[in-house]
Each structure stands twice: as structure tokens, then as C-alpha cells.
């Protein structure tokens, strides 16, 4: 009995050591504390990381997020995985996407946000509590920011802005704009949502996200909207330069 108990104890100690080692490896790679591996995708190799405790990172701790409620995470993960499996491993690698950090109530400089991309660490932080109405689209919106930041030369914002009517002007920054609504316009006039009108990169990300979720509806709208049609063609051409096999 003694030997049996000792073997069990050694196994438990080993598992604890392995878990701690994994946590240290994750921190060394992406510099976010209190994470654990939630799942490694067999489809495209994404490492999904769960937050065991609240964390604070960035300049002066300006990025904060809370630990995940496990029941909430279990429910949201079904949606998250379904959407991210639309991207193959080769495409993700080309766009510096490897780690998805899952947490609740994500803030940057006291502003709530759905996601924070970091191509240097190949990491995307996702707020699993983001508004359910827009949640799936937000996932692709944030993926686009990873894509654009990885290939800025293919997403010329001056060229993009030239598609708009001459009198239109974007805001100076997304956070200094009151153009925040995410609902799809009935009459697009070059923009799918009010948020699209904030800055060029958000405009691109909004179109990309809608194409990933509801391509047919957006293409139908573009048939009556030349500006939107040009923007869609621009995104498709840019993506083809990154990965010719990519399809919406």
C-alpha cells in the first residue's frame, strides 16, 4: 500500500511540475501571466489559452482582462473554434496567428474592446464576453487586424480612402471617434456600419468580417454600391497576394 501511495504521489508531483513548466513556457513566449493551455487545434494548430487569474500587461498595465468563468468559456469556445477553423494552418502562419488568449472583460486604456492583436508575439487576446450579437463577426474582425498588421504593404490606406466620396473624411483614430455602431446599414453608400467610418483599418476589418460571416448578403449590397464593390475587390486582391488559396 505504501509503495502504491508513493507512486500516486510521484505522478501528482510530476503533473504539477509539467503544468508549471508549460505555464512558464507560455509566459516566456507571449509575456502574459496566469495562462494555461485550454486546447490545441487538430485542424490548424491554434493554441487556445485560458486565463486562470486576472492579468494586467502593456505600458503602465494599460491592458487588463479577467479570468474566464469555465462554464462561460465552455459555451463560447464552441463558437470560437467553429469560426477560427475557417482558416488553415498555412494562412495562419503567414499572418502570425498562433495563440488565442481567452478571457473576460478586456480593456485597453479603460476602453472595452473585443480583441487585441499582437503580431510580434503571434497572439490575439479575445474577450469571450463581447456582445453576443456581434461576437462571431468580431472574431474575424480581429483576425483581419492580424492580417493587415502582418502585411501593411498590401493594405495601402491612402488607396483605400480614395474609394470614398471626396467629401468624406475618416476620424483621426478609432478611439477618438463616436462612430461606434456595429449594425449593418440598409443603405451602405460605401460603408457597412457606422464603425466602418472611424478609420480605414476598421473599415477594412468590418468588410472582411462580414464577408467571412455573410458573403452573399454583402456581395448583393455591393451590386448597388460601387464604392463597396471596389473595397471588396481591393481586399480580395490583397488577400490573394498573401495566400492565393484563400477563399471567403
Task: Give short role names for the model-derived ranges.
Residues 57-120:
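Auxiliary, metal-adjacent structural segments of Zn-dependent hydrolase domains
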Residues 24-72, 104-105, 172-185, 201-203, ...:
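Non-catalytic architectural context of zinc metalloproteases
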Residues 99-248:
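Active-site-flanking segments in enzyme catalytic domains
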Residues 1-9:
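Positively charged n-region of N-terminal signal peptides that target proteins for export
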Residues 8-17:
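Sec-dependent N-terminal signal peptides
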Amino acid at each position: 500500500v505504501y509503495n502504491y501511495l508513493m507512486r500516486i504521489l510521484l505522478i501528482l508531483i510530476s503533473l504539477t511540475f509539467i503544468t508549471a513548466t508549460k505555464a512558464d513556457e507560455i509566459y516566456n513566449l507571449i509575456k502574459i501571466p496566469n495562462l494555461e493551455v485550454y486546447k490545441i487545434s487538430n485542424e490548424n494548430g491554434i493554441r487556445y489559452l485560458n486565463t486562470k487569474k486576472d492579468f494586467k500587461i502593456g505600458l503602465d498595465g494599460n491592458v487588463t482582462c479577467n479570468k474566464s468563468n469555465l462554464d462561460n468559456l465552455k459555451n463560447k469556445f464552441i463558437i470560437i473554434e467553429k469560426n477560427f477553423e475557417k482558416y488553415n494552418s498555412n494562412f495562419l502562419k503567414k499572418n502570425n496567428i498562433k495563440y488565442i488568449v481567452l478571457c473576460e472583460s478586456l480593456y485597453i486604456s479603460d476602453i472595452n474592446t473585443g480583441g487585441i492583436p499582437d503580431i510580434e508575439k503571434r497572439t490575439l487576446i479575445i474577450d469571450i464576453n463581447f456582445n453576443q450579437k456581434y461576437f462571431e463577426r468580431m472574431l474575424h474582425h480581429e483576425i483581419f487586424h492580424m492580417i493587415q498588421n502582418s502585411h501593411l504593404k498590401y493594405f495601402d490606406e491612402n488607396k483605400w480612402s480614395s474609394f470614398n466620396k471626396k467629401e468624406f473624411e475618416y476620424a483621426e483614430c478609432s478611439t477618438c471617434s463616436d462612430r461606434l455602431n456595429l449594425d449593418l446599414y440598409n443603405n451602405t453608400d460605401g460603408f457597412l456600419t457606422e464603425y466602418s467610418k472611424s478609420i480605414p483599418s476598421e473599415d477594412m476589418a468590418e468588410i472582411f468580417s462580414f464577408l467571412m460571416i455573410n458573403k452573399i448578403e454583402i456581395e448583393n449590397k455591393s451590386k448597388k454600391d460601387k464604392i463597396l464593390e471596389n473595397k471588396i475587390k481591393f481586399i480580395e486582391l490583397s488577400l490573394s497576394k498573401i495566400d492565393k488559396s484563400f477563399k471567403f
